[in-house]
């Protein structure tokens, strides 16, 4: 460790690891170490960390569920951020709208919607990975994609500035968006249609087959 990483380690403790092996976070079980690996417990800790590293100009990489990520054997220079458990929260806002943390798995969102009689999110049960990654990639399958159910997202940039972005402010294209690389998605609001749990469950099963 150098002086700066030693200071970071003292400030963030167990949430920050130097030369962390990334293969354990990849579905492919491949990949070398991250120069600095940080797993913030919450938004405030993330903002504090970004403030600490700003002057060092570290390149920042966001690691989601690792389902669609190939990591070099030589590892990753700079900072790898993997959002912690507080970013996997999910809650019902209205009878057809939910708010989800960026780190929650797509399948869990689909099941939560099903259990609350919200349709149009069945396709998420077929997509590996997290909601944050799904938004960045405009993930979809079977004629549906996440842009159709996304109302808005909350993001934070590499300077620690938070903002809300509505669906119509994002340009979606096939398996991608125009969201800036320095944006870290914190959460999203998704809107489906009111339905019945049995109907939703049946559609999920049809899609998975």
Residue ranges with predicted function:
Residues 16, 22, 28, 90, ...:
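Short clusters of hydrophobic/aromatic residues that line enzyme substrate/ligand-binding pockets
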Residues 39, 82, 101, 124, ...:
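Residues in well-ordered beta-strands of folded domains
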